[in-house]
Amino acid sequence: MLAKRIIPCLDVRDGQVVKGVQFRNHEIIGDIVPLAQRYAQEGADELVFYDITASSDGRTVDKSWVERIAQVIDIPFCVAGGIKTIEDAEKLFAFGADKISINSPALADPTLISRLADRFGVQAIVVGIDSWFEQETGKYWVNQYTGDETRTRQTHWQLLDWVKEVQQCGAGEIVLNMMNQDGLRNGYDLAQLKLVRGVCRVPLIASGGAGKMVHFRDAFIEAKVDGALAASVFHKQIIEIGELKSYLVQSAIEIRSE
Protein backbone atom coordinates (compact mmCIF):
# COMPACT_ATOMS: atom_id res chain seq x y z
CA MET A 1 0.00 0.00 0.00
CA LEU A 2 1.34 3.43 -0.93
CA ALA A 3 2.04 5.78 1.94
CA LYS A 4 -0.44 8.60 2.42
CA ARG A 5 0.78 12.10 1.62
CA ILE A 6 0.60 15.33 3.63
CA ILE A 7 0.60 18.31 1.27
CA PRO A 8 0.73 21.95 2.32
CA CYS A 9 -0.90 24.25 -0.24
CA LEU A 10 0.39 27.72 -0.95
CA ASP A 11 -1.97 30.07 -2.78
CA VAL A 12 0.12 32.71 -4.52
CA ARG A 13 -0.96 36.18 -5.60
CA ASP A 14 1.42 38.95 -6.66
CA GLY A 15 4.41 36.95 -5.46
CA GLN A 16 3.10 36.37 -1.93
CA VAL A 17 1.30 33.52 -0.19
CA VAL A 18 -2.31 34.37 0.63
CA LYS A 19 -5.25 32.50 2.18
CA GLY A 20 -8.97 33.08 1.97
CA VAL A 21 -12.15 31.48 3.27
CA GLN A 22 -14.35 29.77 0.69
CA PHE A 23 -12.02 31.28 -1.94
CA ARG A 24 -12.80 34.88 -0.83
CA ASN A 25 -11.29 37.68 1.27
CA HIS A 26 -7.66 36.60 0.98
CA GLU A 27 -5.18 37.77 3.58
CA ILE A 28 -1.42 37.90 3.05
CA ILE A 29 0.44 35.10 4.86
CA GLY A 30 4.02 35.86 3.82
CA ASP A 31 6.80 35.28 1.32
CA ILE A 32 6.85 32.11 -0.76
CA VAL A 33 10.40 30.83 -0.38
CA PRO A 34 10.75 30.88 3.45
CA LEU A 35 7.37 29.18 3.83
CA ALA A 36 8.27 26.49 1.30
CA GLN A 37 11.58 25.88 3.08
CA ARG A 38 9.82 25.59 6.42
CA TYR A 39 7.38 22.98 5.15
CA ALA A 40 10.13 20.93 3.52
CA GLN A 41 12.08 20.96 6.79
CA GLU A 42 8.99 20.03 8.83
CA GLY A 43 8.41 16.88 6.79
CA ALA A 44 5.86 17.75 4.11
CA ASP A 45 5.71 15.06 1.42
CA GLU A 46 5.19 17.56 -1.36
CA LEU A 47 3.99 21.11 -1.90
CA VAL A 48 1.34 22.58 -4.16
CA PHE A 49 1.51 26.15 -5.40
CA TYR A 50 -1.57 27.79 -6.91
CA ASP A 51 -1.10 31.08 -8.74
CA ILE A 52 -4.73 31.80 -7.95
CA THR A 53 -5.43 34.69 -10.32
CA ALA A 54 -3.43 33.46 -13.34
CA SER A 55 -6.40 31.93 -15.16
CA SER A 56 -8.82 34.74 -14.43
CA ASP A 57 -6.14 37.30 -15.40
CA GLY A 58 -5.51 35.49 -18.68
CA ARG A 59 -1.84 34.80 -17.94
CA THR A 60 0.30 31.87 -16.89
CA VAL A 61 2.20 31.26 -13.64
CA ASP A 62 4.82 33.82 -12.63
CA LYS A 63 7.90 31.67 -13.23
CA SER A 64 10.39 33.77 -11.25
CA TRP A 65 9.44 32.16 -7.95
CA VAL A 66 9.16 28.63 -9.40
CA GLU A 67 12.89 28.55 -10.09
CA ARG A 68 13.70 29.91 -6.63
CA ILE A 69 11.56 27.20 -5.01
CA ALA A 70 13.31 24.46 -6.99
CA GLN A 71 16.67 25.71 -5.75
CA VAL A 72 15.83 25.61 -2.04
CA ILE A 73 13.64 22.53 -1.45
CA ASP A 74 14.30 18.85 -2.04
CA ILE A 75 10.74 17.52 -2.06
CA PRO A 76 8.42 17.29 -5.08
CA PHE A 77 6.26 20.27 -5.88
CA CYS A 78 3.33 20.94 -8.15
CA VAL A 79 2.49 24.26 -9.80
CA ALA A 80 -0.86 25.50 -11.08
CA GLY A 81 -2.20 28.63 -12.67
CA GLY A 82 -3.22 29.54 -16.20
CA ILE A 83 -1.44 26.65 -17.93
CA LYS A 84 -3.10 26.50 -21.36
CA THR A 85 -0.46 25.05 -23.69
CA ILE A 86 2.32 22.47 -23.95
CA GLU A 87 4.77 25.39 -24.04
CA ASP A 88 3.43 26.80 -20.75
CA ALA A 89 3.96 23.42 -19.11
CA GLU A 90 7.40 22.91 -20.63
CA LYS A 91 8.64 26.15 -19.10
CA LEU A 92 7.43 25.17 -15.63
CA PHE A 93 9.07 21.75 -15.84
CA ALA A 94 12.26 23.42 -17.09
CA PHE A 95 12.22 25.73 -14.07
CA GLY A 96 12.03 22.69 -11.77
CA ALA A 97 8.38 21.80 -11.14
CA ASP A 98 7.77 18.06 -10.69
CA LYS A 99 4.07 18.21 -11.57
CA ILE A 100 1.67 20.69 -13.05
CA SER A 101 -1.98 21.08 -12.18
CA ILE A 102 -4.69 22.42 -14.46
CA ASN A 103 -8.18 23.46 -13.50
CA SER A 104 -10.06 26.25 -15.32
CA PRO A 105 -8.15 25.75 -18.62
CA ALA A 106 -9.15 22.06 -18.62
CA LEU A 107 -12.80 23.06 -18.29
CA ALA A 108 -12.38 25.39 -21.24
CA ASP A 109 -10.65 22.68 -23.30
CA PRO A 110 -10.64 19.10 -21.92
CA THR A 111 -8.29 17.97 -24.72
CA LEU A 112 -5.57 19.95 -22.93
CA ILE A 113 -5.41 17.14 -20.35
CA SER A 114 -4.78 14.52 -23.04
CA ARG A 115 -2.17 16.61 -24.82
CA LEU A 116 -0.25 17.27 -21.61
CA ALA A 117 -0.47 13.63 -20.50
CA ASP A 118 0.76 12.41 -23.89
CA ARG A 119 3.69 14.81 -23.82
CA PHE A 120 4.81 14.60 -20.19
CA GLY A 121 3.25 11.37 -18.84
CA VAL A 122 0.14 10.99 -16.71
CA GLN A 123 2.20 10.94 -13.50
CA ALA A 124 3.05 14.63 -14.02
CA ILE A 125 -0.47 15.87 -14.78
CA VAL A 126 -2.83 16.77 -11.94
CA VAL A 127 -6.35 18.07 -12.45
CA GLY A 128 -7.73 20.38 -9.78
CA ILE A 129 -11.50 20.43 -9.37
CA ASP A 130 -13.28 23.20 -7.47
CA SER A 131 -16.58 21.74 -6.29
CA TRP A 132 -19.57 23.52 -4.79
CA PHE A 133 -22.44 21.79 -3.00
CA GLU A 134 -25.77 23.37 -3.92
CA GLN A 135 -28.01 22.84 -0.93
CA GLU A 136 -31.28 23.54 -2.76
CA THR A 137 -30.74 20.73 -5.27
CA GLY A 138 -28.39 18.47 -3.31
CA LYS A 139 -26.01 18.49 -6.29
CA TYR A 140 -22.26 18.99 -6.49
CA TRP A 141 -21.23 21.36 -9.28
CA VAL A 142 -17.84 22.21 -10.74
CA ASN A 143 -16.81 25.88 -10.62
CA GLN A 144 -14.39 27.77 -12.85
CA TYR A 145 -12.14 30.85 -12.41
CA THR A 146 -12.37 30.61 -8.63
CA GLY A 147 -9.20 32.66 -8.03
CA ASP A 148 -11.17 35.84 -8.74
CA GLU A 149 -14.49 35.96 -6.91
CA THR A 150 -15.88 38.46 -9.42
CA ARG A 151 -15.35 35.96 -12.25
CA THR A 152 -16.16 32.68 -10.50
CA ARG A 153 -18.82 30.81 -12.43
CA GLN A 154 -20.66 27.52 -12.10
CA THR A 155 -20.11 25.26 -15.10
CA HIS A 156 -22.58 22.81 -16.62
CA TRP A 157 -20.52 19.93 -15.21
CA GLN A 158 -21.76 17.96 -12.24
CA LEU A 159 -18.88 16.76 -10.11
CA LEU A 160 -18.91 13.01 -10.72
CA ASP A 161 -19.31 13.44 -14.47
CA TRP A 162 -16.28 15.73 -14.59
CA VAL A 163 -14.23 13.34 -12.43
CA LYS A 164 -14.95 10.57 -14.94
CA GLU A 165 -14.20 12.86 -17.90
CA VAL A 166 -10.79 14.03 -16.68
CA GLN A 167 -9.70 10.45 -16.02
CA GLN A 168 -10.66 9.44 -19.55
CA CYS A 169 -8.61 12.38 -20.81
CA GLY A 170 -5.50 11.23 -18.93
CA ALA A 171 -5.42 12.92 -15.53
CA GLY A 172 -2.84 11.18 -13.35
CA GLU A 173 -4.17 12.60 -10.09
CA ILE A 174 -7.16 14.63 -8.91
CA VAL A 175 -7.17 17.32 -6.23
CA LEU A 176 -10.71 17.92 -5.01
CA ASN A 177 -11.03 21.47 -3.67
CA MET A 178 -14.28 21.46 -1.72
CA MET A 179 -15.22 25.13 -1.75
CA ASN A 180 -17.99 24.94 0.86
CA GLN A 181 -15.43 23.77 3.44
CA ASP A 182 -12.48 25.90 2.36
CA GLY A 183 -10.82 27.75 5.23
CA LEU A 184 -13.51 26.88 7.79
CA ARG A 185 -11.45 24.17 9.55
CA ASN A 186 -14.56 22.07 10.24
CA GLY A 187 -13.24 18.97 8.53
CA TYR A 188 -13.20 17.60 5.01
CA ASP A 189 -16.54 16.77 3.38
CA LEU A 190 -16.31 13.00 3.82
CA ALA A 191 -19.60 12.30 2.05
CA GLN A 192 -18.39 14.13 -1.03
CA LEU A 193 -14.98 12.44 -0.92
CA LYS A 194 -16.60 9.01 -0.69
CA LEU A 195 -18.75 9.75 -3.74
CA VAL A 196 -15.71 10.82 -5.73
CA ARG A 197 -13.61 7.92 -4.46
CA GLY A 198 -16.27 5.59 -5.85
CA VAL A 199 -15.56 6.73 -9.43
CA CYS A 200 -11.93 7.80 -9.10
CA ARG A 201 -9.30 5.25 -10.12
CA VAL A 202 -6.32 7.63 -9.91
CA PRO A 203 -4.80 9.11 -6.74
CA LEU A 204 -7.29 11.41 -5.01
CA ILE A 205 -6.22 14.34 -2.85
CA ALA A 206 -8.65 15.94 -0.36
CA SER A 207 -8.59 19.73 -0.08
CA GLY A 208 -10.71 22.12 1.94
CA GLY A 209 -11.68 22.03 5.60
CA ALA A 210 -8.80 20.59 7.64
CA GLY A 211 -8.76 22.04 11.14
CA LYS A 212 -7.69 19.22 13.44
CA MET A 213 -5.48 16.17 13.14
CA VAL A 214 -8.52 13.90 13.31
CA HIS A 215 -9.78 15.45 10.08
CA PHE A 216 -6.76 14.06 8.24
CA ARG A 217 -7.23 10.66 9.84
CA ASP A 218 -10.91 10.55 8.86
CA ALA A 219 -10.15 11.46 5.25
CA PHE A 220 -7.55 8.70 5.00
CA ILE A 221 -9.53 5.99 6.80
CA GLU A 222 -13.16 6.77 5.91
CA ALA A 223 -12.81 8.28 2.43
CA LYS A 224 -9.65 6.36 1.48
CA VAL A 225 -7.98 9.37 -0.11
CA ASP A 226 -4.33 9.14 -1.12
CA GLY A 227 -3.28 12.52 0.17
CA ALA A 228 -4.59 15.40 2.23
CA LEU A 229 -3.93 18.99 1.31
CA ALA A 230 -4.27 21.88 3.75
CA ALA A 231 -3.26 25.52 4.00
CA SER A 232 -4.34 27.67 6.95
CA VAL A 233 -3.71 25.06 9.66
CA PHE A 234 -0.10 24.82 8.48
CA HIS A 235 0.42 28.52 7.68
CA LYS A 236 -0.80 29.56 11.13
CA GLN A 237 0.96 26.64 12.86
CA ILE A 238 -2.26 25.27 14.31
CA ILE A 239 -0.96 21.85 13.25
CA GLU A 240 2.72 20.95 12.98
CA ILE A 241 3.48 18.45 10.23
CA GLY A 242 5.79 16.24 12.30
CA GLU A 243 3.21 15.93 15.08
CA LEU A 244 0.50 15.20 12.52
CA LYS A 245 2.53 12.39 11.03
CA SER A 246 3.18 10.86 14.46
CA TYR A 247 -0.55 11.02 15.23
CA LEU A 248 -1.42 9.31 11.94
CA VAL A 249 1.13 6.56 12.50
CA GLN A 250 -0.48 5.91 15.90
CA SER A 251 -3.79 5.58 14.02
CA ALA A 252 -2.23 2.78 11.93
CA ILE A 253 -2.04 4.91 8.78
CA GLU A 254 1.01 4.37 6.61
CA ILE A 255 2.86 7.66 6.34
CA ARG A 256 6.18 8.57 4.78
CA SER A 257 8.65 8.94 7.62
CA GLU A 258 11.62 11.27 7.49
From Swiss-Prot:
List the InterPro entries hit by this protein, alphabetically: Aldolase_TIM, His_biosynth, HisF, IGPS_HisA/HisF, RibuloseP-bd_barrel
Highest taxon above the source species: Bacteria
- Tell where it localizes: Cytoplasm
Stretches that traverse the bilayer: none
Which residues catalyse the reaction? Answer: D11, D130
EC main class here is lyase
Cellular component terms (Gene Ontology): cytoplasm
Q: Kindly tell me the pathway this chain contributes to.
A: Amino-acid biosynthesis; L-histidine biosynthesis; L-histidine from 5-phospho-alpha-D-ribose 1-diphosphate: step 5/9
The alphabetical list of record keywords is:
Amino-acid biosynthesis, Cytoplasm, Histidine biosynthesis, Lyase
Q: Which GO terms describe its molecular function?
A: imidazoleglycerol-phosphate synthase activity; lyase activity
EC number(s) recorded for this UniProt protein: 4.3.2.10
Its principal location? Answer: cytoplasm
- Its Gene Ontology biological processes? L-histidine biosynthetic process
Q: Which SUPFAM superfamilies match?
A: Ribulose-phoshate binding barrel (SSF51366)
Q: What reactions does this protein catalyze?
A: 5-[(5-phospho-1-deoxy-D-ribulos-1-ylimino)methylamino]-1-(5-phospho-beta-D-ribosyl)imidazole-4-carboxamide + L-glutamine = D-erythro-1-(imidazol-4-yl)glycerol 3-phosphate + 5-amino-1-(5-phospho-beta-D-ribosyl)imidazole-4-carboxamide + L-glutamate + H(+)
Q: How does it assemble?
A: Heterodimer of HisH and HisF.
Q: Name the family the entry cites.
A: Belongs to the HisA/HisF family.
PANTHER family attached to this UniProt entry: IMIDAZOLE GLYCEROL PHOSPHATE SYNTHASE HISHF, IMIDAZOLE GLYCEROL PHOSPHATE SYNTHASE SUBUNIT HISF/H IGP SYNTHASE SUBUNIT HISF/H
Entry-linked HAMAP family: HisF
**What the protein does?**
IGPS catalyzes the conversion of PRFAR and glutamine to IGP, AICAR and glutamate. The HisF subunit catalyzes the cyclization activity that produces IGP and AICAR from PRFAR using the ammonia provided by the HisH subunit.
| Name the record gives this protein | Imidazole glycerol phosphate synthase subunit HisF
Gene symbol here is hisF
